């Protein structure tokens, strides 16, 4: 179980490499802690650099505060991250390892807490010059703040540091609206505007002109002519062909007449049918009658 007493004061150093939060044993080392806090209140830490590393410690500049010989057996240099100062030197330092040889010779009055120990180690790993002690790019303390003063009546006491002011919102850029105007040429201005209208399909189908064209009277179809040689055509010979094909009255009857048999009774004179047929049809019928007689009374179409 640790024998270290509880801390009673607190302060923060804001460096370029992060925050260093320090808890202070103000009850055990009142004079040293009061001098340390007073130096912060006076602004002595603002702008200083932690520019030296030596003897497993990072050193601050001398002359910032005074140290009294307040040795306490419960406070020892047994780890890294402790804040100490030697009487008569008045130069604070931060340990990087255990420094037991300083017990009884220097005063331990504070300790780093939280992530501050890792910030200290990062500072200690900075590049050093030829002497091996001085940092080439030291960490700078931008400002210091007392968060728990413990003591009353510290002169020039600062208020608790206000949070970093938020960056002012950038003004919103309003885009300029550009209106483009095109001048019309004389030819375009003289041309009358075109009235183009798009009609729907159902409007076109209801157009009377279109329906008249679709449903108008069309000429009657021409009747198909009966094929030549069809049985439907009447086999009627012209009067001239009948006279030629008729057998002579004198003498024995011809073979054609005997095969054809007696001529049927004519319903009337042939001349009555002739005017109803064209000359071409009459010629066709005469040819068929003659061919029938030559075939011996057989139907020329049926063979």
UniProtKB/Swiss-Prot annotation:
- What is the E.C. number? 5.2.1.8
Pfam families documented for this protein: Pro_isomerase
Q: Among the record's GO biological process terms, what is one?
A: protein folding
Q: Where in the cell is it found?
A: Cytoplasm; Nucleus
What main location does UniProt list? cytoplasm
A molecular function annotated in GO for this UniProt entry is: peptidyl-prolyl cis-trans isomerase activity
Question: Where is region (Disordered) located?
Answer: 155-195, 208-274
Q: Write the record's keywords in alphabetical order, separated by commas.
A: Cytoplasm, Isomerase, mRNA processing, mRNA splicing, Nucleus, Rotamase, Spliceosome
**Matches recorded under InterPro entries:** Cyclophilin-like_dom_sf (IPR029000), Cyclophilin-type_PPIase_dom (IPR002130), Cyclophilin_A-like (IPR044666)
Gene Ontology CC: catalytic step 2 spliceosome; cytoplasm
Quote the catalytic activity from the record. Answer: [protein]-peptidylproline (omega=180) = [protein]-peptidylproline (omega=0)
Q: Does the keyword Isomerase apply?
A: yes
- Per UniProt, residues of the PPIase cyclophilin-type domain are 7-153
Function summary: PPIases accelerate the folding of proteins. It catalyzes the cis-trans isomerization of proline imidic peptide bonds in oligopeptides. Involved in pre-mRNA splicing.
Q: Which family does it belong to?
A: Belongs to the cyclophilin-type PPIase family. CWC27 subfamily.
How it assembles, according to the record, is:
Associated with the spliceosome.
UniProt-recorded name of the protein = Peptidyl-prolyl isomerase CWC27
